[in-house]
From Swiss-Prot:
Lineage per the UniProt record: Bacteria, Pseudomonadati, Pseudomonadota, Gammaproteobacteria, Enterobacterales
The family this protein is said to belong to: Belongs to the class-II aminoacyl-tRNA synthetase family. Phe-tRNA synthetase alpha subunit type 1 subfamily.
Residues forming coiled coils: none
Organism: Shigella boydii serotype 18 (strain CDC 3083-94 / BS512)
Annotated Mg(2+) binding sites: E252
Name of the protein in its database record: Phenylalanine--tRNA ligase alpha subunit
Textual note on the cofactor: Binds 2 magnesium ions per tetramer.
Keywords recorded for this protein, A-Z: Aminoacyl-tRNA synthetase, ATP-binding, Cytoplasm, Ligase, Magnesium, Metal-binding, Nucleotide-binding, Protein biosynthesis
EC number(s) per entry: 6.1.1.20
Gene3D superfamilies: Bira Bifunctional Protein, Domain 2 (3.30.930.10)
Length: 327
């Protein structure tokens, strides 16, 4: 554990030397990120005898907590110093006339959701909603992701207990809809979802929209045509679009969709596929009679691509200087 103490000391030294919040965030990633020095210490537990692992794990968690507390304290110091500097530099001219009250505007993510709902509404899709506190059946099992399935490891899930959780995707709405009605089904399901991740491109809460069609004679060609029309409508350009083979437990075949960016590079925008027969069976729909396709996309990511925003966290900081750009 001496090596652990050295890591904590090294982290605290780096924290104290961080000159701004961006540098401090780099330190956080270096030590507490998914591949951070302290996070990787948890992988060493498998080398210990079983009876020693709980105590060793507690020591590692205590070390991580020390570093997190130091990060929080330093962040507060930096933010306070920045505020004091700004206040010292600002002056107020009391002779200026009062400012008029400005009209508000829609949040950029709300604009994106409204735009997508409008497009799919014209295609006959209806908006479906479901609970944000979900059970593991609707969030995983019914979507062909049983308890032993390795795909569960891809979700950093907020669990309340062994069966209740904050939903990691809006796919549960599709399951509830298919259980409640027989085909034809044509829905989109926008909503908040939750995953335990926070950095420049991830937040613990974000918005997702999934779409579902189930009917007779639905093919991958229908899926491609629908998404081609949607993406060109959303970005208001005749985009180059490609479908790459991928894997999702609840669709087969599966694909990820990319668009060509202005820099000449492909950008991933959404995932999709034909509804897996097991999913249809789970909700009492005969896959020999019906087929369907599904797609899912992150609202913040599409908003970032549409408006050229580089940091997802800006959408949640309520900075009017940023939000006014979208009025």
């Amino acid at each position: 554990m001496s090596h652990l103490a050295e890591l904590v000391a090294s982290a605290k030294a780096a924290i104290s030397q961080a000159s701004d919040v961006a540098a401090l965030d780099n330190v956080r990633v270096e030590y507490l990120g998914k591949k951070g020095h302290l996070t990787l210490q948890m992988t060493t537990l498998r080398e210990l005898p079983p009876e020693e692992r709980p105590a060793a794990g507690a020591v590692i968690n205590e070390a991580k907590e020390q570093v997190q507390q130091a990060l929080n304290a330093r962040k507060a110091e930096l933010e306070s110093a920045a505020l004091n500097a700004r206040l010292a530099a600002e002056t107020i001219d009391v002779s200026l006339p009062g400012r008029r009250i400005e009209n508000g505007g829609l949040h950029p993510v709300t604009r994106t959701i409204d735009r997508i709902e409008s497009f799919f509404g014209e295609l006959g899709f209806t908006v479906a909603t479901g609970p944000e506190i979900e059970d593991d059946y609707h969030n995983f099992d019914a979507l062909n992701i049983p308890g032993h399935h390795p795909a569960r490891a891809d979700h950093d899930t907020f669990w309340f207990d062994t069966t209740r959780l904050l939903r990691t995707q809006t796919s549960g709405v599709q399951i509830r809809t298919m259980k409640a009605q027989q085909p034809p089904i044509r829905i989109i399901a926008p909503g908040r979802v939750y995953r335990n991740d926070y950095d420049q491109t991830h937040t613990p809460m974000f918005h997702q929209m999934e779409g579902l069609i189930v009917d007779t004679n639905i093919s991958f060609t229908n899926l491609k045509g629908t998404l081609h029309d949607f993406l060109r409508n959303f970005f208001e350009e005749d985009l180059q679009i490609r479908f790459r083979p991928s894997y999702f437990p609840f669709t087969e075949p599966s694909a990820e969709v990319d668009v060509m960016g202005k820099n000449g590079k492909w950008l991933e925008v959404l995932g999709c596929g034909m509804v897996h027969p097991n999913v249809l069976r789970n909700v009492g729909i005969d896959p020999e009679v019906y087929s369907g396709f599904a797609f899912g996309m992150g609202m913040e990511r599409l908003t970032m691509l549409r408006y050229g925003v580089t940091d997802l966290r800006l959408f949640f900081e309520n900075d009017l200087r940023f939000l006014k750009q979208f009025k």
